[in-house]
Amino acid sequence: MVLAKNCSFCGKAIEPGTGIMYVRKDGAILYFCSNKCRKNMIELNRVPRYVKWTNEYHELKKMRAKS
């Protein structure tokens, strides 16, 4: 059984056989669901918690609303 991976940028589940696996020079493996996520993280150096359409942003927003 093949396990589903989560996108390293937006946190969305990636179906087996789809997406992009990116390996950094230091050996870290990053999984991306789309070219949009890959470009935002690799080329534009954006942090997921500051981009409004990511799961990490929404989780942080919920935490702020509770306090």
UniProtKB/Swiss-Prot annotation:
Protein's UniProt name: Large ribosomal subunit protein eL24
BP term (GO), one: translation
Cofactor: Zn(2+)
GO molecular function: rRNA binding; structural constituent of ribosome; zinc ion binding
InterPro entries (UniProt xref): L24e/L24_sf, Ribosomal_eL24, Ribosomal_eL24-rel_arc, Ribosomal_eL24-rel_N, Ribosomal_eL24_CS, TRASH_dom
TM regions (residue ranges): none
SUPFAM superfamilies named in the record: Glucocorticoid receptor-like (DNA-binding domain)
Gene3D superfamilies, sorted: Ribosomal protein L24e
NCBIfam families documented for this protein: PRK14891.1-1
Pfam entry (one): Ribosomal_L24e
Organism for this UniProt entry: Thermoplasma acidophilum (strain ATCC 25905 / DSM 1728 / JCM 9062 / NBRC 15155 / AMRC-C165)
Cofactor, free-text remark: Binds 1 zinc ion per subunit.
A GO-annotated cellular component: ribonucleoprotein complex
Keyword tags: Metal-binding, Ribonucleoprotein, Ribosomal protein, RNA-binding, rRNA-binding, Zinc, Zinc-finger
Its job: Binds to the 23S rRNA.
Residue positions binding Zn(2+): C7, C10, C33, C37
Family statement drawn from the similarity comment of this UniProt entry: Belongs to the eukaryotic ribosomal protein eL24 family.
Segments forming C4-type zinc fingers: 7-37
Subunit structure: Part of the 50S ribosomal subunit. Forms a cluster with proteins L3 and L14.
